[in-house]
């Protein structure tokens, strides 16, 4: 599901959450160790979202696909995961706002999963969590020049890697899959 597809779904259904925020919530819950299927996903969404139960029920098939897409991205051995954000055709100020919404959603999802800062195993993951919290406060006061675009791209890449790091720190071996080894003969 693309950012634009999710945005349209949420607008049609009348959700209070933005596409970036909702994807962040789902990824945060995943990073916090939750694996949600069927009614567990529905109940988690009811607990995390401000939107009405009927809206969530109407959109549940699409939200289930988004959940599966997010889990697949976070567990991909090629590190294919990306936060769901608007594309380059969107003005930079709106992309920065969406990034702040995604990071706040991610933090909310982590909190809803029961994760606390003490749960993280490494200093790197704890630092990444602190950086994500700082990005959640991001604003835009630039003029949209190339330098601003480069800064945004670097933040987006950092956010992608930080989310993968936190997820992998807390993931079970079943989430990551069997380790591959290379043997020299």
Where are these regions (language model features)?
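Domain-length accessory/inserted modules outside core catalytic folds
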Residues: 1-103, 107-185
């Amino acid at each position: 599901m693309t950012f634009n597809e999710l945005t349209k779904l949420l607008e049609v259904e009348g959700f209070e959450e933005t596409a970036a925020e909702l994807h962040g919530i789902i990824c945060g819950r995943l990073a916090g160790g939750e694996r949600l299927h069927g009614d567990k996903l529905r109940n988690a969404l009811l607990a995390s979202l401000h939107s009405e139960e009927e809206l969530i029920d109407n959109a549940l098939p699409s939200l289930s696909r988004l959940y599966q897409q997010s889990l697949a991205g976070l567990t991909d051995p090629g590190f294919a995961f990306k936060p769901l954000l608007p594309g380059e055709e969107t003005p930079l100020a709106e992309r920065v706002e969406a990034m702040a919404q995604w990071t706040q959603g991610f933090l909310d999802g982590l909190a809803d999963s029961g994760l606390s800062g003490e749960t993280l195993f490494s200093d790197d993951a704890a630092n990444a969590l602190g950086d994500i919290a700082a990005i959640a406060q991001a604003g835009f006061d630039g003029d949209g020049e190339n330098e601003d675009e480069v800064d945004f791209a670097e933040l987006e890449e950092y956010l992608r890697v930080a989310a993968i790091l936190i997820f992998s720190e807390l993931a079970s071996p079943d989430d990551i899959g069997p380790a591959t080894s290379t043997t020299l003969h």
